[in-house]
Amino acid sequence: MYKSAKFWDRAADKYAASPIRNQDAYEATLDKMRQLLSPDDTVLELGCGTGTTALALAASVQHIIATDVSDAMLDKGREKAQAAGTTNVDFRQSDAADAPAGPFDAVLAFNLLHLIEDMDGALAEIAKRTKPGGLFVSKTFCMPEHRNMIWWFIQLGLPIMQAIGKAPYFAKLSTSDLDAAITKAGFTIVETINAPGKDPRRTVIARRAD
């Protein structure tokens, strides 16, 4: 966790200042989450970054514990929560392995799983923290099926950036790899949503087996 935390601490200012790339798709994700969540839900978000999603969903649930490995990211989240007057989001430093035990009605992991070296281990920890029948929603970068510019960058450009400390670990997952890993962890997939256009991210909505 230490190496990853250092990278994201360095990236926090730039990350916080960067606009959301596809605002319409992001708003659609938030709308979907509001349909799935209930006012009495307790929620765990892993890899919350600067807390944008947790704060956007706070009014739809009872309580959110928003976690990240980066203290710098979390500090920005706390500042945003204070500015917004949001009191039901608790920001804590942790990864999946040492996240609060719960169990939670819902666990969220947006733009995270492809950045975890031991994804199977992380998913097992997520399952432990999800109530039986509870919700697990992830949005994950999956490799494009065709050799487009994104595919070539990941194959050729990303390793160079990683070598000089400008990019984190990145798993080259196919959609079938992702779905199989989530199922193996004890979840039943109820819906998948592929992002529109050239956005290679896949949303998986799953429930933990009773």
Q: What is each stretch, according to the model?
A:
Residues 1-38, 144, 154, 160-162, ...:
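Conserved class I S-adenosyl-L-methionine
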Residues 22, 141-185, 191-193:
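C-terminal alpha-helical "lid/dimerization" subdomain adjacent to the S-adenosyl-L-methionine
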Residues 38, 116-117, 130-131:
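Helix-to-beta-strand junctions that scaffold the AdoMet/dcAdoMet cofactor pocket
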Residues 44, 50-97:
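Class I SAM-dependent methyltransferase SAM/SAH-binding core
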Residues 97-107:
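A short acidic, Gly/Pro-enriched loop at the edge of an enzyme's catalytic core
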Residues 106-119:
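A short SAM/SAH-binding and catalytic strip from SAM-dependent methyltransferases
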Residues 120-132:
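A short glycine-rich, Lys/Arg-flanked "PGG" loop and its adjoining helix->strand segment in the class I
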Residues 134-140:
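Conserved beta-strand signature within the Rossmann-like core of class I S-adenosyl-L-methionine
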